[in-house]
Design a protein with these regions (language model features):
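Rieske [2Fe-2S] iron-sulfur-binding domain
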Residues: 59-165, 169-175
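C-terminal catalytic domain of Rieske-type non-heme iron oxygenases
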Residues: 3, 85, 91, 152-415
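Generic structural signal for secondary-structure transition and capping sites
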Residues: 47-51, 98, 219
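Non-catalytic accessory segments flanking enzyme active sites
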Residues: 32-71
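Short, contiguous pre-domain boundary segments
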Residues: 9-31, 191
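Short, flexible segments with low predicted structural confidence
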Residues: 10-18, 123, 180-186, 256-257
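Short Pro/Gly-enriched beta-strand edge/turn motifs at strand-loop
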Residues: 48-60, 130-135, 265-269
Length: 415
């Protein structure tokens, strides 16, 4: 028998009661992992209105530094302006919707100029120039800046965005209050961590399979032979809140001396941060479609760490996430086959994925209820038109198109 098969996994949690883990719990159905309709609903209910962790503020040391992101087809930019503030906006020109920021995923610019008709914008997203529009009446430059995105920098320096176009999205504190004040992280100097490299791995798997897999170590003894060098898999801990999952483990004295003290936090819906003395990883699961996703990794190195100390952990994690990719591809293949509906999860050893699934279930049902009451799809990230005559006419045109897609005037078009 292999060493891996001899290992036993034990997960403790402050969330359990004496009666809460006596029976297995049924997981989400497989249709939630491959349905195109569910994927579209998730774009509206989750990725258009939830706070999303993107990166760390130390990626923007100078004015003009910018990074480009894409979440379920929503491409947006985060940039530092000349006042030192970070701003986020959709990468959509207000004139004819052409992408304004091009040329890679990051860079430094003094201004953002659209290559279609020459409209240009400042680092805060305000419209700077619209050629020949100064000849027109009733054109307000102040109302034609890039579509702003809500942005928050937490106490640790992590940068969050919320794509909800309303003035008042759900508060960040609703799900994450205090998550940037963790006692186990109070001695971490976040300024010591600088980007070493980043990479992505695309695959044929739903993003939630990645989340389920990351948030339990029940599979670790079977599939990750390197992990016992990082922690004692027999003494792991998983604590959960409504929007977060905290993972920790016990290290031997030798592991502590090697800088293996691990603290991992998953942030619903699709990001996590793993930090150790020599290494930090920001992991983002980015949906590309109902059954395809990208695993994106930003790898930071402690500037005070040696090459050996950093690579001992960085190389281990690179192997682990590659192994996880293979697991998720295999599981997704069988979910798509239409035989498997759902399995029974261990309420203690798989407490993390169960917590994730419950958060997701609640968010989906909450938004679906709003849509049923409204009698239409609700896209929180969508542009809100002003209340003027031209905009009202535009709304009528849009309503016609909406009725076509919803089958509202099928009888008129039938022949």
């Amino acid at each position: 028998m292999s060493t891996a098969n001899k290992l036993k996994v034990n997960v403790e949690s402050d969330n359990f009661t004496e009666t809460s883990h006596r029976s297995p719990v049924r997981a989400l159905p497989s249709t939630w992992y491959n349905s195109p309709e569910m994927y579209e609903l998730e774009k509206r209910a989750i990725f258009s209105k939830k706070w999303l962790l993107t990166t760390h503020q130390n990626r923007f040391p100078k004015a003009g530094d910018w990074m480009k992101f894409n979440t379920t087809g929503y491409e947006f930019v985060i940039a530092r302006d000349r006042k030192g503030n970070l701003n986020a906006f959709h990468n959509v020109c207000r004139h004819r919707a052409f992408p304004v920021v091009q040329g890679g995923q990051q860079g430094n610019s003094s201004i953002f100029a659209c290559k279609y008709h020459g409209w240009s914008y400042g680092l805060s997203g305000n419209l700077a120039k619209a050629p020949n529009y100064d000849q027109l009446e009733n054109f307000d430059k102040s109302k034609n800046g890039l579509f702003k995105i809500h942005l928050k920098v937490d106490a640790y320096g992590f940068v969050w965005v919320n794509l909800d176009s309303s003035e008042n999205p759900e508060p960040w504190t609703r799900y994450f209050e205090g998550i940037d004040q963790q006692e186990r992280l109070e001695k971490v100097n976040w300024d010591d961590y600088t980007l070493n490299n980043e990479y992505s791995m695309e695959g044929e798997y739903n993003w939630k399979i990645l989340a389920d897999n990351f948030n339990e170590c029940y599979h670790c003894p079977t599939t990750h032979p390197d992990l016992p060098t990082l922690a004692d898999l027999g003494k792991t801990k998983c604590d959960t809140g409504e929007g977060w999952i905290k993972h920790s483990s016990i290290q031997t004295e030798e592991q502590k001396k090697s800088g293996m003290q691990l603290a991992s936090t998953y942030f619903y819906p699709s990001a996590s941060v793993v930090v150790l003395p020599h290494f930090m990883m920001i992991q983002r699961f980015m949906p590309l479609g109902p059954t395809s996703s990208s695993m994106h990794y930003q790898i930071f190195r402690n500037k005070n760490s040696s090459e050996e100390d950093f690579h001992n952990i960085a190389d281990l994690y690179a192997r682990v996430v590659s192994e996880d990719k293979d697991l998720c591809i295999g599981a997704q293949k069988n979910l798509n086959a239409g035989i498997f509906v759902s399995g029974e999860l261990h309420p203690r050893l798989e407490h993390g994925p169960l917590s994730f699934q419950e958060s997701h279930r609640q968010a989906i049902h909450e938004h679906a209820k709003l849509e049923r009451e409204a009698g239409r799809q609700i896209w929180p990230a969508r542009q809100k038109l002003p209340s003027d005559e031209a905009a009202e006419a535009n709304k009528e045109d849009e309503a016609l198109c909406s009725s076509l897609s919803c089958g509202g005037i099928q009888e008129v078009l039938a022949w």
